[in-house]
């Protein structure tokens, strides 16, 4: 592993933070640091039982290492351990959250909005669908619709919220089919449609412009789940159509979810939910016998939304979560200070590098006669999937699993995914493909900026790993 800069970054910053509280009586230092060191060494050994998620040779799941500054800022904040539920628990970190969320909203083109961080994308999506249900009011049986390729959490969330849920079939590109969506909308019982910008399986981008056009005709909420793909809004020139057009109109959605702990270089868990209509804060209205006492005493922060009473807001007043780590807000704020969300900045260049790596890997795979690529074309974002040529879906799945294991033996870590066989080019054998037949495929998420520079080495290891299983 490379030398970790975090201890050095923390040393001076910790001194400065402690100086902020120097007027307080001193406390005795923690005792028995030898025993703590021993336990921490045991922790280090236990953590060695992990895949090397931080390394570019890990190209499997959606795992991107936090920026060193994010780790340092998070650790520094833990000296205070703020709780961003209320300002009583985190004054500075609440303000930093408001500022960081403002930057995220601005990336999507919103200057007026309601939003906050969450402990996960799941919680962020839950809040968005909860508001959709609340907005539907007393109309019983109003459904949530999402593509069959949307994250499974939407189905589970809808069940928790007791909202009927229906899946809309996807096309061979993994995008929601508009003809099937309109057939559901004609039934007149749809509260909201979930539009995914970057599906988990293949990074597909649902056709948001067409969904918005249907909203004008049928009247429903549009929730954009951009938990994975949201940050790629910064690199439109690196995207192809129709994905570019989908990102261009995201500001017209009713709500958006994005996960800074995916592409945003943040530690888990850091999600974010945004609402275009600030009046939807009314659905959150509640009081607490324990907190919110300081609202009227605090001066307003220049960038924060106002509470329902007109004073400075406690973030818990516009959130379903109660206790929530203020350190996550501190880490995100610090990262965005260093790497602003600018299309011409260093952060955006890193996103473009991952996208370029995915396109190059896809190009090489399409030139390999042993591979069946997606019929519909190249990756929309930075996720590559491919099927292995074989006489049957079962044999193809077995080969994929064998290569997956062989790659791991070569210190290259990929992922597996089950996809409809019909999404892939027909094999040379002329086999008949059944629409509902699933086949296990290889999958690579190339979300690290370093993946572009490491692609030759990734390819060399992949080819070496392929030699034994495919040659059998």
Explain the meaning of each model-derived region:
Residues 373-413, 417:
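Conserved PLP-binding catalytic core of the aspartate aminotransferase-like
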């Amino acid at each position: 592993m490379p030398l970790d800069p975090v201890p050095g970054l923390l040393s001076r910053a910790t001194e400065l933070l402690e100086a902020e509280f120097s007027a307080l009586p001193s406390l005795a230092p923690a005792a028995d640091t030898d025993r703590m060191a021993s336990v921490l060494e045991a922790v280090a050994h236990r953590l060695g039982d992990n895949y090397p998620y931080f390394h570019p040779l890990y190209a499997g799941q959606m795992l991107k290492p936090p920026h060193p500054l994010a780790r340092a800022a998070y650790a520094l904040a833990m000296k205070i351990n703020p709780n961003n539920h209320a300002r009583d628990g985190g004054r500075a970190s609440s303000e930093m959250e408001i500022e960081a969320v403002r930057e995220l909203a601005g990336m999507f083109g919103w200057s007026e909005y309601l939003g906050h961080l969450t402990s996960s994308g799941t919680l962020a999506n839950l809040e968005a669908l909860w508001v959709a249900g609340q907005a539907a009011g007393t109309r019983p049986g109003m459904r949530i619709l999402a593509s069959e390729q949307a994250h499974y959490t939407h189905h589970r969330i809808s069940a928790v919220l007791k909202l009927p849920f229906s899946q809309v079939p996807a096309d061979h590109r993994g995008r929601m089919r508009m003809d099937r969506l309109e057939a559901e909308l004609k039934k007149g019982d749809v509260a909201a449609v979930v539009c995914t910008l970057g599906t988990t399986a293949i990074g597909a981008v649902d056709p948001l412009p067409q969904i918005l056009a249907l909203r004008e005709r049928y009247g429903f909420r549009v929730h954009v789940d951009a938990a994975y793909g949201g940050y790629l809004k910064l690199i439109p020139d690196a995207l192809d159509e129709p994905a570019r057009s989908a990102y261009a109109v995201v500001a017209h959605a009713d709500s958006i979810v994005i996960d800074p702990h995916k592409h945003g270089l943040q530690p888990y868990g850091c999600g974010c939910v945004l609402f275009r209509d600030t009046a939807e804060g009314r659905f959150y209205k509640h009081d607490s016998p324990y907190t919110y006492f300081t609202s009227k005493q605090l001066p307003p922060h220049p960038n924060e939304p106002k509470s329902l009473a007109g004073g400075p807001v406690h973030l818990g007043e516009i959130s379903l979560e109660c206790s929530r780590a203020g350190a996550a807000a501190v880490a995100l704020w610090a990262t965005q200070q260093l790497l602003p969300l600018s299309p011409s900045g260093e952060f955006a260049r890193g996103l473009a590098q991952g996208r370029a790596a995915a396109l190059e890997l896809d190009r090489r795979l399409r030139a390999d006669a042993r591979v069946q690529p997606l019929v519909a074309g190249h990756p929309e974002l930075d996720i590559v999937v491919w099927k292995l040529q074989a006489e049957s879906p079962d044999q193809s799945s077995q080969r994929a699993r064998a290569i997956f294991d062989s790659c791991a033996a070569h210190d290259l870590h990929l992922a597996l995914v089950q996809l409809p066989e019909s999404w892939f080019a027909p094999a040379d054998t002329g086999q008949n493909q059944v629409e509902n037949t699933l086949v296990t495929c290889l999958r690579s998420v190339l979300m690290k900026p370093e993946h572009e520079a490491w692609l030759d080495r990734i390819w060399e290891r992949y080819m070496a790993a392929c030699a034994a299983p495919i040659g059998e």
